[in-house]
Amino acid sequence: MTAPTDPQLHLDQVMSRLTGPGGRFELVEEPVLGTRMPVMKNRGRSVGELLTTSLRWGDRDYLVTADRRMSYTEHAAAVAALATALREDYGVRKGDRVAILAANTPEWVVAFWATQVLGAISVGLNGWWVPREVEYGLTHSRPTVVVADAKRAETLAAVGTDLPVLTMEEDLPALFARYAGSPMPHTDVDEDDPAAILYTSGTSGRPKGALHSQRNILAVVDYHRFSDAVVGEFSGRPVDPAVPSPLRYLLTSPLFHIASLHNLVIPRLATGGAVVMHQGGFDVDAVLRLVERERVTNWGAVPTMASRLVEHDDLDKYDLSSLTSFSLASAPSSVAFKERLREKVPFARNALVDSYGLTECSTAIAVATAPELEQFPGTLGRPIITVSMEIRDPYGEWLPDGVEGEVCVRSPFVMLGYWEDEAATAAAIAPGRWLRTGDYGLVENGRLRLTGRRSDLILRGGENVYPTEIEQCLDEHPEVLECAVIGTPHEDLGQEVAAVVVLRPGAAATEAELREYAADRLSYFKVPTRWRITTDLLPRNATGKMVRRDITV
């Protein structure tokens, strides 16, 4: 059969074949927590089962660092040993929590899978938390045991917890040896049983624990399998699910977030691909050396990392020809930034992808392909498979295309709720399992365009001002590296618009110049009236999101 000359038509036909009756990813409508929605017919029911089936990938690389390699066989043996130790020595049972507090390391991944085969709940604590925040996380999640690296074990000592703490450097190797050869534990779970707790970034308050189910995580795995299959069919190289994937994914974001855990480490175990893990702070040259050595094919980066690539003065000294997919995620980026990225970074020119998602949704809500970013700049693509998306007004009513409102979504990816927080769950999940994202946007040509966070909205004299619009405008100025726009109190207007602008090295733009630049491109009430020009980078959290509450003018 000859493929259509229209790429979009070809893509639609490929997706229809894969998801139609009898297709590998056939879609059916079934009840999920009391609400009917599209789901994949041929799906798994237990996250732990993925570990058992991964044994077929044998001695292939699963986890790779700068100085270590762990095959699928070695990984499964370590998981079986640790799971047995957790069950026999620490009494971990189905539904118990096992907290993981560490930087990115293979042992983090082993601890996650050991928890899963026991039917317990993996709690990914933020490795950047200070003692006060760690204490909150422990009190909130009430784990049976904590697995930590040496540095975070010191933090736990400062907290004074009486929980058992297993260190990755000493305790885990001893347990691997003691329980070597143990059979893999198996625990029966239901599809909607909880599997993991990951904490929200907490950019506007205390972190909440998003509770993800077996269904949520397995749906993410199937989404990535589906995406791989679509690419294979579209390019004329169909994917055989019985053959291990040749793809090698670079992991640069923390494992305690969905980008690295749900959307990389877990699905790649299911497909037989390799996870190449950068450890330590983000160093461009160290990362690029790893890409070159390991022939990395796919990399999902936060915009702050991509910005370091743009500023690098000698990318050509590295052989980066293996990279065929480069995606942005976890934080917004402007059209101007994407243009600079494509111009400066060779592997981003034809492979750049952007997406929109949040912890509560387990994965992306919408994805924009490279052609879409070119044809529809400023948008974030269309909803991914099984995601229903609506724009709603403050009363929860549907709004038509082109009208701005709150982005609301429903899918098998949406979390069960917030761990032990019924009020927050009720506020976030509307009847019919519709998640209120808290983000404002609109739909253009079937594609999502975000306008800002509801919590970031500036109310100036009766006018709604979205910081994102102003930030993206200022970001286009050639001397601006990054910027933040916030609202500050004003006696008459309620709030006024203020901007903190970080200049590029050697730049000398003045407040007057930037004010004039903004005034030429924005309505008068959107032009900042207060400015702070600096060379100090803006505060960001572990996923690269700007922490507005820490910004002052």
UniProtKB/Swiss-Prot annotation:
Entry superkingdom: Bacteria
Pathway listed: Steroid metabolism
One protein family per Pfam: AMP-binding_C
PROSITE patterns found in the cross-reference section: AMP_BINDING
Transmembrane segments: none
EC number: 6.2.1.-
Catalytic activity as recorded in UniProt: cholate + ATP + CoA = choloyl-CoA + AMP + diphosphate; deoxycholate + ATP + CoA = deoxycholoyl-CoA + AMP + diphosphate; chenodeoxycholate + ATP + CoA = chenodeoxycholoyl-CoA + AMP + diphosphate
Record keywords: ATP-binding, Ligase, Lipid metabolism, Nucleotide-binding, Steroid metabolism
Record's note on what induces expression: Up-regulated on cholate.
GO MF annotations in UniProt: ATP binding; cholate-CoA ligase activity; medium-chain fatty acid-CoA ligase activity
A GO biological-process term: steroid metabolic process
Gene3D superfamilies (UniProt xref): 3.30.300.30, N-terminal domain of ligase-like
InterPro entries referenced in this protein's UniProt entry, alphabetically: AMP-bd_C (IPR025110), AMP-bd_C_sf (IPR045851), AMP-binding_CS (IPR020845), AMP-dep_synth/lig_dom (IPR000873), ANL_N_sf (IPR042099)
SUPFAM superfamilies xref list: Acetyl-CoA synthetase-like
Endpoints of the signal sequence: none
Stated role: Involved in cholate catabolism. Catalyzes the transformation of cholate to cholyl-CoA, thus initiating degradation of the C5 cholate side chain. Can also catalyze the ATP-dependent formation of CoA thioesters of deoxycholate and chenodeoxycholate.
Family stated for the protein in its record: Belongs to the ATP-dependent AMP-binding enzyme family.
PANTHER family, per the entry: ACYL-COA SYNTHETASE (PTHR43201), MEDIUM-CHAIN ACYL-COA LIGASE ACSF2, MITOCHONDRIAL (PTHR43201:SF5)
UniProt protein name: Steroid-24-oyl-CoA synthetase
